[in-house]
């Protein structure tokens, strides 16, 4: 009996041990318990040993070759995009990859690996240049999904450090030719604390490259190209090497042509309609003139909204102002015509040299005769003809129209340049003078206004676009 119990116990122990071995084998085959090897353990250990050795006695507060020679920084810039450009704030936005390369002899190492590619965690452990963008208003480094920084160390001590930046940089726009202006917007950088005796920047060959312009947000500008320069700037703290990239931009005129130039031209042309309206239609001509003046005022206000409050006159300001003057002059033309064509009571003009006061002892005219064409009838619907007044063998012309007589200006008033009616054209004052018939002012304006406006446009567009 005891022998049977011992046999059963041995069988149970064997089965239990076998089941445990099967479970262990299954656990070893499961993916969660497998160990993935990304690199040989010896190489991983080699990189760690190299970094530990390089940083063991490294002082990141000191620049390379301090006290021996200046540190040379080679610069590369890759432009992702430019824009938008703000004329009001005098700034533009740019997205770049900024790369700096220099040599640090303290980071030389001997290994089968030529390059150590590291992430942003190593940036704070070594010395990097204190580069600043001198004309930046705001700047932002990209951190999604990780800090957009790259660090590479060569075995000869050369270091490459790149990062992605979005910068709002200042651009002093000269708007004298606006909106036909072109600008060179700079991006300027230098060392913050190291003068040229300690740090020198220089451009690498083909150091500035640009991405495809389809994604750029230059809504009102065309990108014409870029150029880079190097200069020495003297300050109270020393002489600094300053690097500058100029982005050449030319403004597109399409938006301003539609929004400002065409409406202004059409408003000026509309004001000329007044010259073909009868001069006695005072409400119509006055309403048209005031409406066009107010329209030009509104267009002028809208045109200035896209500009900063500069103290000088821009090309658009000049055009809008001249258009306003043309519209205002058209309104004043009718005011002048209406004033000098006013209807007055019938009077007989007397010659100053012929008539005296009744109390005077000199002679008084004793014969006045009125003559009119014999074929004119009171029932005639035509305008009344001119009537000749004979006063002591001196003739005067009066224009009768609807019982109104248009009184000629006195001789002393006519002696300047303007002549109202036929009788004003007689006399010694007309010798060598210009004679303008005010009653024909509309006829003159129909030619003068379009011609002068056409000449102005010719000079304006040729001067700003080609000179």
Curated annotation (Swiss-Prot):
Distribution of this protein across tissues and organs: Expressed in brain.
Glycosylated position list: 110, 228
Listed SUPFAM superfamilies: Neurotransmitter-gated ion-channel transmembrane pore (SSF90112), Nicotinic receptor ligand binding domain-like (SSF63712)
Segments on the Extracellular side according to the record's topology features: 18-256, 304-311
Keywords: Cell membrane, Chloride, Chloride channel, Disulfide bond, Glycoprotein, Ion channel, Ion transport, Lipoprotein, Membrane, Palmitate, Postsynaptic cell membrane, Signal, Synapse, Transmembrane, Transmembrane helix, Transport
SS bond list: 171-185
GO molecular function terms listed in the Swiss-Prot or TrEMBL record: GABA-A receptor activity; GABA-gated chloride ion channel activity; transmitter-gated monoatomic ion channel activity involved in regulation of postsynaptic membrane potential
GO CC terms, sorted: chloride channel complex; GABA-ergic synapse; microtubule cytoskeleton; nucleolus; postsynaptic membrane; synaptic membrane
Post-translational modification: May be palmitoylated.
Entry's localization field: Postsynaptic cell membrane; Cell membrane
TM helices/strands, residue ranges: 257-277, 284-303, 312-332, 447-467
Main location: membrane
Assembly and binders: Heteropentamer, formed by a combination of alpha (GABRA1-6), beta (GABRB1-3), gamma (GABRG1-3), delta (GABRD), epsilon (GABRE), rho (GABRR1-3), pi (GABRP) and theta (GABRQ) chains, each subunit exhibiting distinct physiological and pharmacological properties.
UniProt free text on domains: GABAARs subunits share a common topological structure: a peptide sequence made up of a long extracellular N-terminal, four transmembrane domains, intracellular or cytoplasmic domain located between the third and the fourth transmembrane domains.
Family from the record: Belongs to the ligand-gated ion channel (TC 1.A.9) family. Gamma-aminobutyric acid receptor (TC 1.A.9.5) subfamily. GABRG3 sub-subfamily.
UniProt name for this protein: Gamma-aminobutyric acid receptor subunit gamma-3
Name of the encoding gene: Gabrg3
């Amino acid at each position: 009996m005891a022998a049977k119990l011992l046999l059963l116990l041995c069988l149970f122990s064997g089965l239990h041990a076998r089941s445990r071995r099967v479970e262990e084998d299954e656990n070893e085959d499961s993916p969660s318990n497998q160990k993935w090897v990304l690199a040989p353990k010896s190489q991983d250990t080699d990189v760690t040993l190299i970094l530990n050795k390089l940083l063991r006695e490294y002082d990141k507060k000191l620049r390379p070759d301090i006290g021996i020679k200046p540190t040379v920084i080679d610069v590369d810039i890759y432009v992702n995009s430019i824009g938008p450009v703000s004329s009001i704030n005098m700034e533009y936005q740019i997205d770049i990859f900024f790369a700096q390369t220099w040599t640090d002899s303290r980071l030389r190492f001997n290994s089968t690996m030529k390059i150590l590619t590291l992430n942003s965690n190593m940036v704070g452990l070594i010395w990097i240049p204190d580069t600043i963008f001198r004309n930046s208003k705001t700047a932002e480094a990209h951190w999604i999904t990780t800090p957009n920084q790259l660090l590479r160390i060569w075995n000869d001590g050369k270091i490459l450090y790149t990062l992605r930046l979005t910068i709002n940089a200042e651009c002093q726009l000269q708007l004298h030719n606006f909106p036909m202006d072109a600008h060179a917007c700079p991006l300027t950088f230098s060392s913050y604390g190291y003068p040229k005796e300690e740090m020198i920047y220089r451009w690498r060959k083909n150091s500035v490259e640009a991405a495809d312009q389809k994604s750029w947000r230059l809504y009102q500008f065309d990108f014409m190209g870029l150029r880079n320069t190097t200069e020495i700037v003297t300050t109270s703290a020393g002489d600094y090497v300053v690097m500058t990239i100029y982005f050449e931009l030319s403004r597109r005129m399409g938006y301003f042509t539609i929004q400002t130039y065409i409406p202004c031209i059409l408003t000026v042309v509309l004001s000329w309609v007044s010259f073909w309206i009868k001069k006695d239609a005072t409400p119509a001509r006055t309403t048209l003139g005031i409406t066009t003046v107010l329209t030009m005022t509104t267009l002028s206000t809208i045109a200035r909204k896209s500009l900063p409050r500069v103290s000088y006159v821009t090309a658009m300001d000049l055009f809008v102002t001249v258009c306003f003057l043309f519209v205002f002059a058209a309104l004043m033309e009718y005011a002048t015509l209406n004033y000098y064509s006013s209807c007055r009571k019938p009077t007989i003009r007397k010659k100053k040299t012929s008539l005296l006061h009744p109390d005077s002892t000199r002679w008084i005219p004793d014969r006045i005769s009125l003559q009119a064409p014999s074929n004119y009838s009171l029932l005639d619907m035509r305008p009344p003809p001119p009537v000749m007044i004979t006063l002591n063998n001196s003739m005067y012309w009066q224009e009768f129209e609807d019982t109104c007589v248009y009184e000629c200006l006195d001789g002393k008033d006519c002696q300047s340049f303007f002549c109202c009616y036929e009788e004003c054209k007689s006399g010694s004052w007309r010798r060598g003078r210009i004679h303008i018939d005010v009653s024909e002012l509309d006829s003159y304006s129909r030619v003068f206004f379009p011609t002068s406006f056409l000449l102005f446009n010719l000079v304006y567009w040729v001067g700003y676009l080609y000179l």
